[in-house]
Amino acid sequence: MAAEPGGWLGPALGLRLLLATALQMVSAFGAEFSSESCRELGFSSNLLCGSCDLLGQFDLLQLDPDCRGCCQEEAQFETKKLYAGAILEVCGUKLGRFPQVQAFVRSDKPKLFRGLQIKYVRGSDPVLKLLDDNGNIAEELSILKWNTDSVEEFLSEKLQRV
């Protein structure tokens, strides 16, 4: 019994094909491929899922299901730990040997950071001490070779701005 054009078999077959394709796509999105399968598909074992988001920019959306099956979720960034304060220790007589640190100390930039103190300690090379909530030293870093921008950027990440 052959199906005539416009008969019931044509739409039913089309619907079945559409349903099968949809199921195949859904299973591909949920599947994680083995590392060997991913290599065969041309994906790196270090593929991050964020890279799959970029496929659309290059008209490569047909690769998205395989990409999602091979990718690894990116690790969530740690929340930034802000310190209660910091002490920048430097010897006034040695400050001229560290012009970048001198430029930072003598500028208005230290006033931008809550809890930052500048202490002049005789004979001390430039050191940054980060303080915990109790005022204890949590970290101590030599900033001998840091430039002004590095000091400011680091403090921006570690202290609250005023």
From Swiss-Prot:
It is found in: Endoplasmic reticulum lumen. Transmembrane segments: none annotated. InterPro entries: Sep15/SelM_sf, Sep15_SelM, Sep15_SelM_dom, Thioredoxin-like_sf. Its main location: endoplasmic reticulum. Pfam families: Sep15_SelM. Keywords: Endoplasmic reticulum, Selenocysteine, Signal. One of its GO terms (molecular function) is oxidoreductase activity. Residues 1-28 form the signal peptide. Gene3D superfamilies: Sep15/SelM thioredoxin-like domain, active-site redox motif. One of its GO terms (cellular component) is endoplasmic reticulum lumen. May be involved in redox reactions associated with the formation of disulfide bonds. May contribute to the quality control of protein folding in the endoplasmic reticulum. May regulate protein folding by enhancing the catalytic activity of UGGT1/UGCGL1 and UGGT2/UGCGL2. Forms a tight complex with UGGT1/UGCGL1. Interacts with UGGT2/UGCGL2. Interacts with RDH11. Belongs to the selenoprotein M/F family. This is Selenoprotein F. The lineage of its organism: Eukaryota, Metazoa, Chordata, Craniata, Vertebrata.
